[in-house]
Amino acid sequence: MLGVGPGDEVIVPAYTYTATASVVHHVGAKIVMVDVAPDSFETDYDRIADAITERTKVVMPVDLGGVMCNYERVFAAVESKRELFRPANDIQKAFGRVIVLADAAHAFGARWHNRMCGEVADFTSFSFHAVKNASS
C-alpha cells in the first residue's frame, strides 16, 4: 500500500518481535535497525534521525508492554530530515516526509497524551497472535 520495495529502507527498533522486520524483508526493502536507549527497552529516539537517509520511506516504532512510544520524538526525528525524503509514489508524495507506521500490537487500548493508540502515527498495525493483548 505504501509502495515500499527494493531499494527503499525502513527503520525498525532492534528490540522487537521478528514480524516487525520480516514485513520489510518480504517487500524487498532494507531493514535498518536502531538500538534501544541506554537503560531502556524503548528505541533510542536520537538515533532515528541519524538513521534516516534519502532511501528511507518508513519508520516503524513499536509500542511495548502496553506503553506507547514517544511519538513526539519520533515525528521530530522524521521532520528533522524532511529535506532528504524522496517520494516514490502518490501516497508518499502526499505525506512529503518519511511515514510513521506504528506496530501497536502490545498497546491495544493504551493512551498517549490523551490519544488512543491507532490515532497517533500515520498508520498503525495491530497483531492478533496468541501472545498479544487482543488475540484471535
Mark where each language-model region is.
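Conserved active-site segment immediately N-terminal to the catalytic lysine
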Residues: 91-135
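PLP-dependent aminotransferase-like
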Residues: 3-104, 111
